[in-house]
Design a protein with these regions (language model features):
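N-terminal ligand-binding lobe of clamshell/alpha-beta domains
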Residues: 1-254
Length: 254
């Protein structure tokens, strides 16, 4: 097979002499997707790559501080990164060592599924995974008119929330909910508690990145209703999208 050159999500040309067989993933969502689809090709992942729970690969530290020496030692023919989750500096250093790095850029559910399909079919030269087809069926169709106002908290002390142009925001919209902070000038703005604690708003409290729980989060709100939700279902793209619609809807609307 002749070498293939493809443009990643940031339009960077990445050359592959052969379909990659030794893959390091720096993105938890994509690690789960790879481990579910082609586990024999996945040789390294970050400490934050928690799914599947029985994943056994070399760990290469965190998403923001990967152990570049450990990655090099694995002799990967592909490293998968993400514009938001990983540092451009680390991507550049790996590329300078001659390692192909494929960078994804995810802001919507359809965009995530398209990006993952390209990764599996064009880069890895595999077929479309069954879970991806199921996710398309579950999340396809037009965005419904919103019926519930929500805010998505991601941190406290200081409070932060989901703002504009995010994957999570698109998930929320496709569930038929209106993110009351979607008009923010920032993607993840710092906010005052009063910006979230409003009459008629449901505040979603996920368990990542901040670990909200029954005794840490709901007690701060006196006006808004709160709902503890799975951060993975709300923020990860990949196999976790299958079944996420029903689970998130049940957590919020009962």
């Amino acid at each position: 097979m002749p070498p293939v050159t493809l443009a990643d999500d940031l339009a960077y040309a990445v050359s592959f002499p052969t379909p990659p067989r030794r893959v390091v993933s720096l993105v938890p969502s994509i690690t789960e997707a790879l481990a579910t689809t082609c586990p024999e090709r996945l040789v390294g992942a970050t400490d934050w790559c928690t799914h599947p729970s029985d994943l056994v690969v070399q760990r290469v530290r965190g998403t923001k501080n990967p152990d570049l020496a450990a990655i090099r030692a694995l002799e990967p023919d592909l490293v998968v990164a993400n514009k938001e989750e990983n540092r451009e500096l680390d991507v550049g250093r790996l590329r300078a060592d001659g390692i192909p790095v494929w960078v994804t850029d995810i802001e919507t559910v359809p965009g995530a599924l398209d990006s993952l399909e390209r990764l599996f079919t064009e880069v890895l030269q595999l077929g479309t995974p069954g879970w991806l087809e199921s996710a398309r069926a579950e999340w396809g169709g037009p965005v419904p008119e919103p019926s519930i106002d929500v805010a998505v908290a991601i941190w406290r002390d200081p409070w932060m929330a989901v703002g504009r142009d995010t994957f999570t925001g698109d998930v929320v919209a496709r569930l038929g909910w209106r993110n009351v902070l979607a008009g923010s000038s920032e993607r993840y703005p710092h906010v005052e508690l009063a910006d979230l604690d409003r009459d008629g708003v449901v505040v979603l409290l996920p368990d990542e990145p901040y670990v909200f729980g029954p005794d840490d989060g709901p007690e701060a709100f006196t006006r808004a209703r709160t709902a503890l939700v799975s951060g993975r279902l709300l923020t990860w793209y990949g196999p976790s999208l299958v079944g996420a619609r029903a689970a998130l809807s049940a957590a919020v609307t009962g």
